[in-house]
């Protein structure tokens, strides 16, 4: 009786996880596009990172702080932990678990944390 409802609940959670992974993947693409187009500008009053977060905040209707966080996690997913990012995009882990892995490996000197 409850199994079908629980199955739908599990699938909804996986869909939410996949959406979070997709959001970070798209933000990562946006980051690459900005850097290819503008690069790091020494003459700008702000750096490219700030410009990207300002654009994201306006587009998504979120604070710049949250946009900054999304960009940092998107960069971690793309550059440092693509395998963990793949788990998030597949819905196998949730966004909080992804954040925890990123945080705990942020300054890790262990080479296994880096892509091959």
Predicted features along the sequence, with ranges:
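Peripheral, non-cofactor segments flanking catalytic/redox cores
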Residues: 1-116
